[in-house]
Amino acid sequence: MKKRLSELKVGKLAVITEFENDDIFLKLMEMGCIPGETIKIDQIAPLGDPISITVAGYHLSLRLDEAEKIWVEETIISKQH
């Protein structure tokens, strides 16, 4: 089931499926976030912003508004801390 990256909980894994707009796509593509890539939620700040992720072997922080524009398909296997 597709959902926004911002909806995932810490430790969850998902595959990036699409982005809502081209502006965010170019920025994220430069950081290794491309459709088909597996992404893991590492940490969510107490107020929900920013969200720390791991993608393509890199640790990145995304603002909540960026995470809301990324659509993912959650995987069955998740790594819990």
Regions of interest found by a model, annotated:
Residues 1-18, 78-81:
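SH3-family beta-barrel domains
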Residues 1-2, 23-27, 38:
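Short alpha-helix capping/helix-loop boundary micro-motifs
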Residues 11, 51-81:
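C-terminal structural segments of small proteins and small subunits
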Residues 11-24, 35, 73:
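Short, structured beta-strand/loop micro-motifs enriched in basic residues and often containing a Trp
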Residues 20-21, 43-48, 59:
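Short, charged beta-turn/beta-strand-edge "cap" motif at the junction between a beta-strand
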Residues 26, 46-53:
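Short, Lys/Arg- and Gly-enriched loop/turn segments at beta-strand edges
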Residues 34-42:
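Conserved beta-strand/loop element in small beta-rich adapter and peptidoglycan-binding domains
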